[in-house]
From Swiss-Prot:
The gene is coaX. Coiled coil: none annotated. This is Type III pantothenate kinase. CDD domains: ASKHA_NBD_PanK-III (cd24015). The active site is at D87 (proton acceptor). ATP binds at D7, V8, G9, N10, S11, S12, V13, D14, T110.
Length: 229
């Protein structure tokens, strides 16, 4: 069986082409690139954080079914579930399915999100700016600082503008992750598996298991529920 899984982000669209349990092709496209492409007329499951772009996706992939939070079989223990993004629930479900009931999910993209699944329940987390967005905003707002693109920069002291900017942004992100992991381990007195995903996930792979297809694997796992979604 051939089908697609689609993850619509704030600035890109990720598409996986599956044949059974294997990914045969994977595309990461900007919104502009996506609109120029043609796709096979296959059934598809998708999630979207950018509803304004979802109908354009439907125009290119007519057989897509966008999933809702309630489609993912995971208990949500969150103060404002009505404002919780489907992407966070989808990632929490996927992490629980493949990595166990106590897991931290780090999703690195436009936003850097770190969420906690505790005893199989989604509990919440923290959200901050992604690495690329930090660099872009700094360049836009600070005259004289050029725009740099994300890199993994492990230095103890920046000695050029490039090193200072990249090192500062990267260290801010890594310290955010380190301090959160330390806090949760102390508060909840547990060891957590840590899984990293997202377009910028490779820069933080040292913190755990890097799984760039995490949410796609979760959606594939839901395919047996397709006719009930």
């Amino acid at each position: 069986m051939r089908f697609l899984t689609v993850d619509v982000g704030n600035s890109s669209v990720d598409i996986a082409l599956w044949e059974g349990k294997k990914v045969k092709d994977f595309l990461k496209l900007s919104h502009e690139e996506f609109l120029k492409e043609e796709f096979p007329k296959l059934k598809a499951l998708g999630i979207s954080v950018k509803q304004s772009f979802s109908e354009k996706v439907r125009g290119k992939i007519p057989k897509i079914k966008f999933l809702k939070k309630e489609n993912f079989p995971i208990q949500v223990d969150y103060k404002t579930p009505e404002t919780l993004g489907t992407d966070r629930v989808a990632l929490a479900y996927s992490a629980k399915k493949f990595y166990g009931k106590n897991v931290v999910v780090i999703s690195a993209g436009t936003a850097l999100v770190i969420d906690l699944v505790l005893e199989g329940k989604f509990k919440g987390g923290f959200i901050t700016l992604g690495l690329g967005k930090k660099l872009k905003i700094l360049s836009d707002l600070a005259e004289g600082i050029p725009e740099f693109f994300p890199e993994e920069v492990e230095i103890f002291l920046g000695r050029s503008t490039r090193e200072c900017v990249l090192g500062g942004a990267y260290r801010e992100s890594t310290e955010f992750i380190k301090s959160t992991l330390k806090l949760w381990r102390k508060v909840f007195k547990r060891k957590f598996k840590v899984v990293i995903t997202g377009g910028e996930g490779k820069y933080f792979s040292k913190f755990g298991i890097y799984d760039p297809l995490l949410v796609h694997r979760g959606m594939r796992n839901l395919l047996y529920l397709y006719h009930r979604i």
